[in-house]
C-alpha cells in the first residue's frame, strides 16, 4: 500500500514537470559544455585529448541531472512564462548558483579535471540559453498579443502615469486575449521619462501633450493610473482630458495599488468627485474619537445619505452604543447589515423604526437608552417636492426637530447637533425656510436648556448646535446621479439654468467636518457651524465635462437641455446671513455664525400656530412661514 502511495506521489510530481522543456534544457546543457570544450581547442575536435572527451561523457549526465533538478526545485518548470518577469529571472539565477555548487561537488567525487574554461564558459552558456528560451516564449507571446490588426482594435488606449499602476494596466492589456484593445502611448509629468518605453509602449509626453497624442493615435479611451497623485493634480489632468472626445476612466485609489488589485476590471468612470479636485479634509481624529468614545449616540434619519455616513464614522470611534433611528425600514436595515458585517459583536448597535413626529416614541427611546449625543439628520430635503407638499416639510422638518430637541432637554442629553443646509440662508423655497426654522429652534432650545440648568443649580445642560453645508455628492437628492442616468440613456442632459452654481462636497467629507464641528460645540454651543465647501461649481460646466469624460461631445452626441429654474430654486446659495457674522475655528474649513437675537416667547407662540396650520393642511402655510422667517418670500 505504501509502495503504491509513493509511486502515485512521484507520478503526481512528474505531472507538474514539463517533459519537453526538461529535454530541451538537457540538450542546451550538453551542447553548452561541449561548445565550451570546442572553444578551448579552437574548434578542432581532433585536438581534444581523449581524457577530456571521456571526462565530458562522464560528467555531463551529472550536470544535466543537477541542472534539471535545480530548475524544478525553483519552480521554473511550473512558471507561466507568458507572464515572466524579474521574479522568474531571479529564481533562474538561484537555480544556476546551486547548480554550479553541484558541479563542484561532482568534481570532488569524480576527480575528473577539465579545463578551467570548460566550467566557466559551459556554466555561463547553459544559464544564458536555458533562460533565453524561456523569455523568448514571453517575447513571442507579447508579439502575438500585439499582432492584432488595427482594424480589429475597438479600444485605442492612452495611459496617464508611468508608475507602478500604469505598468500593471499596460501588462494586463498586453496579456488579455479577450479585449480588443491596445495601449498606444503613455504620458507622464516626469519629463525625464519621455521617449522611454514601458513594455514596448512609448512614453510620448507630459499632460500638455494629451490632446495632440489623442489625435495622433486616434485614442478613444484615456486611463488615469495615478492613484497616489494629489486630487488637485488629478483635477488638472482631467481638465486637459476633457478637451478630447475620449472616454476617461481611473483607478479607484491608492489602496488598490498597495494591495496589488490594480486591474482593468477595477477601473471606473471619472466621477464628479474627481472633477472637484478637493484634497482630503483635515480633522482632528484623536479629539473627535475621544468625544465619541464610550458615549451613547443616537442618529435620527440614520438610514439616509448623511445619516448612514454619520453611523459609519461614529461606529469607527468606539461608542458605548450606536442607535440608528429611521422611519424607512429599508434604509435602516441596509446600514444595520453593513455595520454588523464590519464590526460584529464589538459594536453595540441598536436599530429602531419610528418617526420624529411621534413624541411618545422619542420619549420611550431616550428613557430606555439615555443617549449622550444626538445627531439630528431626519428631514425632507427635496426642494421641488416640498414646494408641492409644504405642510409635510413643516411637520417633519420643523416640528420633528422641535420634538427631538425638547425630548433631549427632558432626558438630559449632553449634546444635540442639527444637520442643516445652506438653503436655510435667505431661503427662496419652503424646504430651506423650514431648515432655517430648525436652526432657530435649536438656538432657542439652547437658551432654554441653559436657563433651566441655572434654575436648578446645575452646571450640565444640553448644548445645541447646527452644522450648515451645501450639496453633497451621492445623496438621494443630488443632481449627479440624474446626469449619469441621462448620459447612459443617450441624453438629453437637463440643466435648469446655464448660470446656476452650487457648492459641492462628498458625503464622507461633510460628515467628517460635522463630527469636528460637534466637538467644537462643547465650547461654542448655540452657534451655527458653517462648512467650507470649496469653490462653487457651475452646473452647466459640470454636466458638459461629465459628457466629455464619458466619451461623448456635448450638443453633438448628447444634447444639453435647459429647463428653467424649478419652483423655489435660486441661481446661487449663500453660507451665512449678514447678521450672523463670521468667526473662524482652528480648522480652516469650519466657521461659526452666531445666533440672531429673537424673542423666544413670541417664537413659541408662532410655532404653535404653525403646527396647527400644518396639521390642518392650511393653504397659507408658506405665508405663515414667511412671517417667522423674514428673508423668505414665497413665489406663490
What are these regions (language model features)?
Residues 214, 218-220, 319-320, 366, ...:
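Proline-aspartate-enriched helix->loop->beta-strand connector
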Residues 235-251, 321-328, 373, 388-415:
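NAD(P)-cofactor binding segment of oxidoreductase domains
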Residues 30, 34, 38, 57, ...:
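A solvent-exposed beta-alpha-beta segment
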Residues 265-269, 273, 277-370, 581:
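N-terminal Rossmann/SDR dinucleotide-binding element
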Residues 282, 287-291, 444-636:
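Strand-loop microenvironment adjacent to phosphate/nucleotide-handling motifs in alpha/beta enzyme folds
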Residues 1-153, 157, 178-181, 194, ...:
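Signature of alpha-helical transmembrane segments in polytopic membrane proteins
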Residues 2, 234-296, 409:
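Flexible, Lys/Arg-rich cytosolic regulatory linkers and terminal tails that connect or flank
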Residues 260, 376, 382-383, 387-439, ...:
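Conserved Rossmann-fold NAD(P)-dependent oxidoreductase catalytic core, especially the SDR/UDP-sugar
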